[in-house]
C-alpha cells in the first residue's frame, strides 16, 4: 500500500478525470480520495506493476488522459517524486512556446529554469519571457547563477529578474502582456534563512494580482510548504482564495497527503477559456 494518499478538493472535477475513474461531476466542493481510484484501476492496485510502469515504459498510456503525468503522479504517490516535479508536468500541459509566465518566488532558480525551457522557441532562442521575482537578494543571485550555468547569454535575456515581493508582480509585467502562468513556492528559501518566509497578507495580494493578469486558459500553480510557523495559516488563505473564485470561470483543486501532515500541498487554479 502506498505511503500516503492524496485528497483532492475540487470546485468541479474535469470531465476527463471523471471519465478516467468513472466519477460523477458535481458543482460543489467535493473530495476525491485516491483509495477509490486504487480499487478501480488495476495499475494503481498492483504496486509492482505501477513501479514498472513509471520506471520503464513511455508515459501517456491509452488509459491516462494527460501526457507525461502518469509517470510522475504515480511516482509521487509512492514517494519517488517531489511535489515540484508534479507541478512541472502540469505546467507542460498549459505553457506554450512564446508564452509569458511568472515565477513569483524564484528561490534557487529551478522553477525559473524549467519555465524558460518551456517558453523558448528552439529555432529562434527566445520568443517567450519569464518574469522571476523574489524578495531576497540571495535568491535572485542564486537564480542568476543557475541560469549562467544552464543556458547561454541569449537565452538568459528571456528571463527578467526582480528583487521584489511577489505582491508587486502587477508592477513588473508590461500592461499588454498576456500571462499564461503564475507559479508560487510558498515558505522559506531552501538553504537560506528560515526566519524569512512568505506571508499570508502579501501572498493574498499576489494571488489577486495573478487573477487580474492571467489570460483565459492560464494557470496559477502553488506548492505550499506548511511545516514552519505560519505555513498552515498561509495555506488557509490560499484555500479561501481558491474557494471564492467563480466556478463558471475557474477550476481549483488541492492535492494533499493524508498521513503526512507536514508534506507540501499542491494547489492548482485553472482559468477557463470561455
Curated annotation (Swiss-Prot):
Chief site of localization: plastid
Organelle targeting sequence: 1-50
Keyword Transmembrane helix: no
Domain of life: Eukaryota
Keyword presence, Ubl conjugation: no
GO molecular function: methyltransferase activity; mRNA binding
Coiled-coil residue spans: none
Keyword vocabulary terms for this entry: Chloroplast, Methyltransferase, Plastid, S-adenosyl-L-methionine, Transferase, Transit peptide, tRNA processing
UniProt pathway: tRNA modification
Known catalytic reactions: 5-aminomethyl-2-thiouridine(34) in tRNA + S-adenosyl-L-methionine = 5-methylaminomethyl-2-thiouridine(34) in tRNA + S-adenosyl-L-homocysteine + H(+)
GO cellular component: chloroplast
UniProt-annotated binding residues for S-adenosyl-L-methionine: 108, 110, 134, 136, 166
Subcellular location: Plastid, Chloroplast
Gene Ontology BP terms: methylation; tRNA processing
Family: Belongs to the methyltransferase superfamily. MnmM family.
Function of the molecule: Involved in the biosynthesis of 5-methylaminomethyl-2-thiouridine (mnm(5)s(2)U) at the wobble position (U34) in tRNA. Catalyzes the transfer of a methyl group from S-adenosyl-L-methionine to nm(5)s(2)U34 to form mnm(5)s(2)U34.
Name of this protein: tRNA (mnm(5)s(2)U34)-methyltransferase, chloroplastic
Lineage, top ranks: Eukaryota, Viridiplantae, Streptophyta, Embryophyta, Tracheophyta
Amino acid at each position: 500500500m502506498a505511503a500516503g494518499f492524496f485528497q483532492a478538493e475540487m470546485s468541479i472535477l474535469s470531465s476527463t478525470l471523471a471519465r478516467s475513474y468513472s466519477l460523477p461531476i458535481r458543482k460543489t466542493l467535493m473530495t476525491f480520495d485516491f483509495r477509490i481510484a486504487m480499487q478501480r484501476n488495476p495499475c494503481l492496485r498492483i504496486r509492482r506493476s505501477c513501479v514498472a510502469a513509471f520506471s520503464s515504459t513511455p508515459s501517456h498510456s491509452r488509459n491516462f488522459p494527460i501526457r507525461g503525468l502518469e509517470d510522475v503522479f504515480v511516482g509521487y504517490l509512492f514517494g519517488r517524486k517531489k511535489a515540484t516535479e508534479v507541478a512541472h508536468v502540469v505546467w507542460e500541459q498549459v505553457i506554450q512556446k512564446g508564452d509569458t509566465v511568472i515565477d513569483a518566488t524564484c528561490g534557487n532558480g529551478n522553477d525559473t529554469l524549467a519555465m524558460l525551457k518551456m517558453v523558448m522557441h528552439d529555432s529562434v532562442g527566445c520568443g517567450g519571457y519569464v518574469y522571476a521575482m523574489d524578495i531576497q537578494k540571495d535568491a535572485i543571485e542564486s537564480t542568476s547563477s543557475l541560469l549562467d550555468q544552464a543556458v547561454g547569454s541569449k537565452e538568459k535575456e528571456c528571463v527578467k529578474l526582480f528583487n521584489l515581493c511577489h505582491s508587486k508582480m502587477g508592477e513588473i509585467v508590461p500592461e499588454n502582456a498576456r500571462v499564461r502562468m503564475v507559479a508560487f513556492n510558498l515558505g522559506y528559501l531552501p538553504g537560506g534563512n528560515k526566519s524569512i518566509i512568505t506571508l499570508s497578507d502579501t501572498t493574498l495580494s499576489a494571488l489577486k494580482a495573478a487573477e487580474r493578469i492571467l489570460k483565459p486558459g492560464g494557470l496559477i500553480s502553488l506548492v505550499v510548504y506548511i511545516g514552519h510557523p505560519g505555513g498552515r495559516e498561509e495555506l488557509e488563505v490560499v484555500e479561501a482564495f481558491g474557494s471564492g473564485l467563480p466556478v463558471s470561470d475557474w477550476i481549483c483543486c488541492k492535492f494533499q497527503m493524508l498521513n503526512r501532515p507536514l508534506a507540501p500541498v499542491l494547489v492548482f487554479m485553472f482559468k477557463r477559456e470561455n
